[in-house]
C-alpha cells in the first residue's frame, strides 16, 4: 500500500540534490515523484491499456507524447471517469473507502478584499478562475488513478492547459511508456463529482527534456528545483467542436515572474492539508491561498507563499495581478512541491517559475 504524497511516511530523502534538506518528496510507483500528486488504486479495475497511439517524440529540448487521438479513445476515457471514480481519486483502497461527502460550503458572491492573506480555504467567490481551473485526472501505468490541478491559459490554439510535469510523467527515459501517465481527463470547474462545463480528453502533451533524468541517480525534486516541473497539455475540443477556451475562458500566462514580495494567489484541489491531514479537504472543491511570494530554498527557480495545501494541488496555478472581482490574473507558475516552515508556522507551497523552457513548451503547444 502506498503512502499518500505529502503525508508523514517515515521516508527520509538522502539523495544528493538541490532540495535534499528542504523539500518533502515521496516515492510513488517505481520512480521518485514530487509530492502533491494524489494517488489512488483504480476502483475495482485491473490496469488499463493506454489510450495513446504514439510514443514519446523528442524535439527542440522538449519531450512530447500523443494523447487520445481517436473518437474511440476519447469516448472510452469519458466513460471511465464516472462521478464516483472522480470522487475516489484520493482513496488508497476505493473498494472499501466511503465516497467522500459533498462540500456544501455556501458560495459568497462578494469579491474577496484585495491582498487578503489566506493560508487555505474553499474558494467561494466565483469569477473566471472557477471556470478555467479544474481537476486533472489520470491513470498511472500500473493502473492506479491519480489527480492534479490544471488551468486553461490564453493561446492561439485556444486549447492550451498548463500543469506540473510530474503530473504527466515520472523521471526516466521519455521513450519508456511506463514513465507516462494515461487516461488524462480535465474537468474545469470540478465540484463535488460534477462536470459543470464538461470533461475534456487530451490530444497531446509535453514536458521539458530536462525533466528527463536518470531515476537511479536523480530525485524528481532535483529537476523540479531546477525549474523544469512544467507540463503543457493540448485539450481535445468539446463534443460540439468548440475549443476548451471558448467554453471556459482562460487565464493569461506570464514568464519570468513574480518579483519577490509580489502578492500571489494559488488555487488547487488538495485531498488534505499539510497541517491538518484529516478531512479538512477531500478534493471536492477548489481551495485558495494568497500571500506575498518568497524565494524557494536554495534555487531561484522555485518560489512560493504560505499555503496549507498538499496532495492533489500539484499543477495548480499561481496567479499574479489577480483581480478578486473578476477572478482573472496571470499564471506565473504552477505548484510543484511544498515545505513546512520552521518554528511551527504554516507550510509553504512552492511553484516552478516559468522560464525559457516553459516558454518553449507554450510556443510548441500553439501549433498543435
Predicted features, each with a name:
Residues 2-4, 39, 43-155:
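Protease-domain processing segments flanking chymotrypsin-fold serine proteases, especially trypsin-like
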Residues 332, 338-368:
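C-terminal cap/linker of serine protease catalytic domains
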Residues 167-168, 190-193, 237-240, 271-272, ...:
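Acidic glycine-/aspartate-rich tracts in secreted/extracellular proteins
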Residues 119-142, 153-154, 178-242:
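Conserved catalytic-core segment of clan PA serine endopeptidases
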